[in-house]
Amino acid sequence: MNASDPAASDSASTSAPGTSSSSASGSTASASAPSAPSPRLRAALETFPPYVPGKPPRQVEGLESFKLSSNENFLPPLPAVLETMVAHATNPALYPDDAALALRQGLADRLGVGLDQLVVTTGASELLVALTQITSDATTEAIYPWPSFEMYPQTTGLVGSTRREVPLTAEGRHDLDAMAAAITEDTRLIILCSPNNPTGPVLRDDEVRAFLDKVPDHVLVALDEAYWEFATEPGRADGLGLVRDYPNLVLLRTFSKAHGLAGLRVGYAVAHPPVIEGLLKAVIPFGVTDLSQAAALESLNHWDEVLERAGEIAQTRDAFAAALREQGWEVPEAQANYVWLPLGEKSGAFEDACVEQAVAVRNLGAGVRISIGEDEALARVLEIAERFRVEHFED
C-alpha cells in the first residue's frame, strides 16, 4: 500500500550526502568497490511489516488540504496547556523526573487508584512494547483481534511470539468466543482494543467480564483504551472497574487523542502492582520529558473540558457516520474519533480519490479509516464518497 509513497521514491533516487553526481550515477570506482557485509539480524523481523504512519495530504492547487489519516485531534490543546508548555520549555540539559511523580499523583487522584498501580510512558505504544517484553518470547503465543492497531503484530512479532490473529465479526467487533477458543497452554498475552482501531465498535462490560472469566489467571490481558473518551455507547466496558476486579488485566490509555497531545508522547497504564513492577523494568528511563509531564498534568486538571470537547467530536462523528449511511454505505458503530468504510479491494481507489482532492485518509487494505476533522474536510469526503459510490457501486 506504500509503493507510491513519494518519500520512498525520493530516498531511492537521491544521492547520499557527500557523494558527487558521478559516484551516485554509477562511476567505475563505486562499481568496483566491494559490497559491505550484511549484519545478521533476527529472523523474526521477516515475519511482520514495519509500522507505517498515516500519510500527509497532497497539495492540490486551489484546495485546502486536510489530514484525516492519523486519528489526530484536529482541535489544539487547551489554552492553559499551551501556557504550561511555554513555562516548562526551559532547560533541556536536565533529565526529567523519571518517576513522573506529579503526573502519576494527578492520575491516581483522578482515577482513584494507588501510585503503585500506575506507570507513565512515551505514549501507549511504548506500553505495548514493554508488555510483550515482560510476557512473551519465541516459546509463547499472543492473541489479538484483526484488523486492529497495527502495532500489535509488530510488538508481538518482535519478540518472536507466535501470533494468533482472530478475525473480527462482520460488524467490526471482537469475536470474544473465538479469542477464548484460541487460548492454549502457550498463551501469555491477549490484547483487546475498545473502541477498536480501525473499525470503531466498543466492547461491552458484560462481555469483557465473561471473557476474562475464561482466561487463565497467568495470562496477561491488555485492554487498549486509547480512544475511550470518545465512546458514548451505553454499557461500554469500564476499564477501571475491570482492572480492580481482575489482577491479570492491564489498562492502556494515552494523552494523544482526546487531550490533543500526540506530539508530546504521554501514555499510561493502570494495573495491579506486580504488573506495574514488571513494566517499570522494561520501559525507557527518562522517556517522558518534563514539558510533556507538565502539559499532561495541566490537561488532566481540565478533565471536564477535555471530556466536553471529546463529546463534541463524538457528535460530529455520529453526524458524519449517519451521512455516509444515508448515501448507502455500511458503516460499523463508530465510537472513537474516526469512521471505518469496509471497502475491501476498492480501498486503494477510494484513497486515490481522496488524494486527488487534497484529503489524506488511511487505507488499511480491508477498508479505509477516516479521522474526524474540520467540517470542511468531512464535507469534502462526503462529496468524494457520493461520487465514488455512483462510479464504482451503481450501474
Language model: regions and residue ranges:
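PLP-dependent aminotransferase-like
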Residues: 134-192
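Short beta-strands and strand-loop turn motifs
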Residues: 163-167, 189-195, 221-225, 332-334, ...
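PLP-dependent aminotransferase class I/II
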Residues: 248-324, 329-332
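Conserved PLP-binding catalytic core of the aspartate aminotransferase-like
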Residues: 313-314, 322-357, 372
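PLP-dependent enzyme catalytic core of the Aspartate aminotransferase-like
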Residues: 2, 10, 353-395
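N-terminal "arm"/small-domain region of PLP-dependent enzymes with the aminotransferase-like
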Residues: 2-11, 17, 28-94
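Phosphate-binding glycine-rich loop
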Residues: 96-141, 376
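Active-site pre-lysine segment of PLP-dependent enzymes
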Residues: 157, 174-186, 198-221, 225-258
